[in-house]
Amino acid sequence: MRTMNLAGMIDHTFLKPEATEKDIVNLCHEAKQHKFATVCINPAYICTAAKLLHGSGVGVATVIGFPLGATMTEIKVQEIFAAKAHGAREVDIVINIGWAKSGNWEAVAKDITRAVEAAHCCGVTIKVIIETSLLTEEEKQKAAEIVKASGADYIKTSTGFAGGGATVEDVRNLKAWVGQSVKVKASGGIRSRETALQMVEAGADRLGTSSGVQIITV
């Protein structure tokens, strides 16, 4: 795979709580230079990133209900509308993990479906994070089925905040479960070109990483 093709699959990510405006400026500069798909940042910096990336072809992605997924559905929906209004093209939203672990799949489905409807209503791409490191195989499959049924654009492995990230096995399984109707984003622990290529080979359509520059310049 050519470097430029790989770069175009990367969400250049900086979601640390201590992220400064200078960090975001640097992130956007790198994203423009290397032609990454998006920058993925916390909501407070959407306006900054949107201004810096205007006309560059690099999108602005942000996170919703992040990283716990325990925000009320109504708040998640309002976050999506606000993100769009401030310049975000894509949103990465976390499922309510506690509901999933409780087996309350109906509530999980309603939460995600409302978020997907809100995102698509305002023309925003939505990626649903299921936090694979916290789920059993059975729970991962059930979550994948719900994401597929919701009409989401992507299913995403991880927030990177739960002590585990993407694995090749998880990416391969998620792709098998959602089929061609939903894309897969691998995120968490992708720090090398080798790992990135393994994720793509397993079925990942997008990669979330803070190591994008290192990955494409080795």
Swiss-Prot record:
InterPro entries registered for this protein in UniProt: Aldolase_TIM, DeoC, DeoC/FbaB/LacD_aldolase, DeoC_typeI
Example GO molecular function: deoxyribose-phosphate aldolase activity
GO biological process per UniProt: 2-deoxyribose 1-phosphate catabolic process; carbohydrate catabolic process; deoxyribonucleotide catabolic process
Protein EC: 4.1.2.4
This protein's GO CC annotations: cytoplasm
Location (main, coarse): cytoplasm
SMART domains to which the protein is assigned, alphabetical: DeoC
Domain of life of the native organism: Bacteria
Chemical reaction(s) catalysed: 2-deoxy-D-ribose 5-phosphate = D-glyceraldehyde 3-phosphate + acetaldehyde
PANTHER family per the UniProt record, alphabetical: DEOXYRIBOSE-PHOSPHATE ALDOLASE
Name assigned to this protein: Deoxyribose-phosphate aldolase
Source species taxonomy: Bacteria, Bacillati, Bacillota, Clostridia, Eubacteriales
